[in-house]
């Protein structure tokens, strides 16, 4: 089998396509959450904390020299990233919880007992006849 045919067989499997769609949607969701945190959540928190802009919070390790930019630890951006992660992780948790709940409901649904086989029906009839003879 040629490499191209193998790749087509691999890529056309449902799981690979589902995974690709999930990755694309996840990346888009990550951008939405990042914007939500940076543009909607953090400004009011900054105002509450006395006009702090979290994007600018940093510790300067070495000042800018000539063309070289300053070396900084940007802990404000790190705080925003932690909030991004927390929101995304919570959304994933809630989604998985809903999926697992649906799976449990499907698993818990009582299955109809299997119909007795012909052998079992014959044995039941023989048993009933023997009981009837013993009662006489």
From Swiss-Prot:
> Where, by residue number, does the polypeptide cross the bilayer?
9-29, 79-99
User: PROSITE patterns in the record, alphabetically?
Assistant: MSCL
Per its UniProt record, what Pfam families does this chain match? MscL
Broad class of where this protein is predominantly found: membrane
Molecular function GO labels:
mechanosensitive monoatomic ion channel activity
Q: Which domain of life is it from?
A: Bacteria
**Record-linked InterPro entries:** Mechanosensitive_channel_CS (IPR019823), MS_channel (IPR001185), MSC/AndL (IPR037673), MscL_channel (IPR036019)
Q: Where in the cell is it found?
A: Cell inner membrane
Membrane topology qualifier? Multi-pass membrane protein
A Gene Ontology cellular-component term: plasma membrane
Do the record's keywords include Transmembrane? yes
Arranged from A to Z, the UniProt key words for this protein are:
Cell inner membrane, Cell membrane, Ion channel, Ion transport, Membrane, Transmembrane, Transmembrane helix, Transport
Keyword Transmembrane among record annotations: yes
Biological role stated in the UniProt entry: Channel that opens in response to stretch forces in the membrane lipid bilayer. May participate in the regulation of osmotic pressure changes within the cell.
* UniProt subunit comment: Homopentamer.
Give the family, as the similarity comment puts it.
Belongs to the MscL family.
Quote the protein name from its UniProt record.
Answer: Large-conductance mechanosensitive channel
- Origin organism is Shewanella sp. (strain ANA-3)
């Amino acid at each position: 089998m040629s490499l191209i045919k193998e790749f087509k067989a691999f890529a056309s499997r449902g799981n690979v396509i589902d995974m690709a769609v999930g990755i694309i949607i996840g990346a888009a969701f990550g951008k939405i959450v990042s914007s939500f945190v940076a543009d909607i959540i953090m400004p009011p928190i900054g105002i509450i904390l006395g006009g702090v802009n979290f994007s600018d919070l940093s510790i300067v390790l070495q000042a800018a020299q000539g063309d070289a930019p300053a070396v900084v630890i940007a802990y404000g951006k790190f705080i925003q990233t932690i909030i991004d992660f927390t929101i995304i992780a919570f959304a994933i948790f809630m989604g998985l919880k809903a999926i697992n709940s649906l799976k449990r409901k499907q698993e818990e649904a009582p299955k109809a007992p299997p119909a007795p086989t012909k052998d079992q029906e014959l044995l039941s009839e023989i048993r009933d006849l023997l009981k009837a003879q013993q009662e006489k």
